[in-house]
Every structure is written in C-alpha cells, then in structure tokens.
C-alpha cells in the first residue's frame, strides 16, 4: 500500500500529530480497533441520527473519509467527512469522542487535528449541522446538552449561519421525517474569516445537494430562509 493512501486507494494527507494523539483512516486500523470505533460511534449518537456503521467504513461514497483519533493504537474518537462537490468545502457528518473519556479535552484535540488535516488536504471550510436548542418541545436537559454542544463549536471558531428553516431528513424525526437543525461552519485557514450571510445561500445549496442529495427544485430548499448579508 502506498504511504498516505487507504486500502481502497483513496489518498489521505499524512497523519497530523498533536502530542501523543494521531488521526488515522479507519480502514488502516486492525479489526479490534475498528470495533472500538464502532462502539464509540454507536454510543455517541441516537438511532435516528446515525447511519449503519458499515456504510461509513466499507461502503463509503466517493469523497468521504472516516477518521479515528488514536492514542497508542487505541481509538478515542471518530469523525466522518464528505466533500461538498468541487466547492473546496467539507461536511462533517459525525464528530464524537469516547463517552468514557469525556471531560479530558479530547474534543478540542480532535477538532484541532481535523482542521489541520483539512488544511493539509486543501480544504477551505468545514460545514456541519447540530440539533437546535430552541426546537419546540425540547426538554430542559436536552436544551442544556444542545447548547453546550453549540458553545463547544463556537469556542473553536465555528459560527451559526443566519439560516432559518433548515431541516434534515431523518426517519424518526416527527411525523414528516424532517428534523429542524442549526447549520454551522468554521474556516479551515488559520485566522480565516468566519462565513456570514454572504456565503450562507451557497453553503445551504451545497449541503442540500451534496450531503442530502436533494434535487435543486426540492421544496425543502425553497423553504430554507437565509438572512440578507449585512450592508
């Protein structure tokens, strides 16, 4: 196998070190380590927010990367990426650290390494969605969890895009199968400006097309509102 490539021939930037931790493609791990990644993933997301694990590892789409944060060959976290077409932007499908190791700063370590990994790969923007703390019917405990998650990303340079009505298709998300979410984005370049209203419409279109595979005329796209950029 050529250094810097996965078993499928997909080219990866070389692992980015931060102290003793390293990001590695999941397909380069041994069977036991892949099993640990699966546990981390399945413990970290409820059923309605996760895909089948094998679809993320053995049956990935072109432009997708499955990465594990590893310490001395032991996985500590998992991230799943998908390129948003030819935009130079990347969608963060999943980002989770081992529940048994939370509170040790691993989320920040993995985030920093992920941004460095994307920078080395020529990426310019990382886009993702999170559960909305303001969703009607969300109980106090869930509001706290969701708000804490948003603040984590904001501390690491991400912003909530000025978008209303953004929803994602999930089989268990209410009667109509669509879940209201917040759309966030973070610049990959060191010190780069955070995206704002001027870029939001293009980001929304790229996410619906390349992450959710919606046709340009899908009514959900028209129902998603983008605030006018500041003058």
PLM feature spans:
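Long hydrophobic alpha-helical segments typical of transmembrane helices together
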Residues: 203-231
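Conserved active-site tyrosine of GNAT-family acetyltransferases
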Residues: 153
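C-terminal "cap" of GNAT-fold acetyltransferases
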Residues: 145, 159, 166-214
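A conserved beta-strand-loop-helix scaffold within acyl/acetyltransferase catalytic domains
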Residues: 42-99
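Short amphipathic alpha-helix that is part of the acyltransferase structural core
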Residues: 9-55, 68-70, 203
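A eukaryotic "domain-to-IDR transition" signal
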Residues: 104, 128-131, 161-164
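Conserved acetyl-CoA-binding loop-helix of GNAT-fold acetyltransferases
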Residues: 97, 103-120
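Conserved GNAT acetyl-CoA-binding A-motif
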Residues: 118-141
């Amino acid at each position: 196998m050529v250094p810097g490539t996965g078993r499928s021939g997909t080219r990866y930037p070389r692992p980015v070190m931060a102290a003793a931790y390293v990001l590695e493609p999941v397909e380069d791990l041994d069977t036991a380590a892949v099993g640990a990644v699966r546990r981390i993933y399945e413990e970290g997301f409820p059923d309605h927010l996760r895909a089948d694990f094998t679809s993320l590892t053995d049956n990935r789409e072109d432009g997708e990367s499955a990465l594990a944060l590893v310490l001395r060959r032991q996985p500590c976290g998992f991230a799943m990426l998908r390129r948003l077409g030819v935009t130079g932007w990347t969608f963060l499908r999943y980002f989770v650290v081992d529940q048994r190791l939370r509170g040790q700063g691993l989320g920040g370590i993995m985030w920093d390494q992920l941004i460095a990994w994307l920078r080395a790969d020529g990426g310019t923007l990382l886009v993702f969605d999170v559960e909305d703390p303001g969703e009607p019917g969300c109980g106090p405990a869930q509001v706290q969890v969701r708000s804490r998650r948003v603040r984590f990303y904001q501390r690491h340079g991400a912003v909530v895009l000025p978008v209303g009505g953004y929803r994602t298709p999930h089989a268990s998300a209410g009667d109509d199968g669509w879940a209201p979410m917040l759309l966030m984005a973070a610049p990959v370049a060191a010190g780069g400006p955070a995206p704002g209203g001027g870029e939001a419409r293009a980001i929304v279109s790229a996410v619906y097309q390349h992450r959710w595979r919606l046709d340009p005329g899908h009514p959900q796209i028209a129902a998603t509102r983008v605030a006018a950029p500041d003058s």
